[in-house]
């Protein structure tokens, strides 16, 4: 079934103003204006973020929705895809954010607006642990774009988390996927936008 509703989930300290989110939104609005696009600003609390997302998509047609997530958003996208059975595209997805973000508790600045501050509370690490899911139920619903040159996350761990999924392993690249323009069409083709 073609995707009629598309959710984009940004990463830690990121926002709907990320380069990837803006490029995807522009492409969807230009070429598939009938597709419902939603890229919310996620709260710092993982539990609050997932509660907001799950409420926001509660009336979406599960067979015709998809999710894209970058970094921590990829972890969240896996949670959403496992809960709904939808397709998911993961862009350098975080695999164990409870481990990786444990050292980032306290006040943080927003990546796209350094004047904006938020607090990443210690108990948010436990919330991340509670959102972790086991092996994915339907690996054919997943497409991961993973850069071996990611300076933040281990590409081997990312690739190993999604056995049986479609994986595009980039020989170089970086965590931000600075060459994302080269991958947009493949991402959107996987999602079969209606």
Q: Where do the model's predicted regions map?
A:
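Short hydrophobic segments within beta-strands
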Residues: 8-12, 68, 145
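Gly/Ala-rich beta-loop-alpha elbow adjacent to hydrolase catalytic centers
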Residues: 68-77
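The alpha/beta-hydrolase serine catalytic core
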Residues: 87-194
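Internal catalytic or translocation cores that form aromatic/hydrophobic pockets or channels
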Residues: 59-65, 86, 91
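Short, conserved beta-strand segments within well-ordered enzyme catalytic domains
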Residues: 36-38, 66-68, 90
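Active-site catalytic motif of lipid deacylating hydrolases and related acyltransferases
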Residues: 2-63
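Active-site phosphate/pyrophosphate- and oxyanion-stabilizing loops and adjacent acidic/basic residues
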Residues: 22, 26, 78, 156-159
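Aromatic pocket-lining residues of Rossmann-like dinucleotide-binding sites
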Residues: 80-84
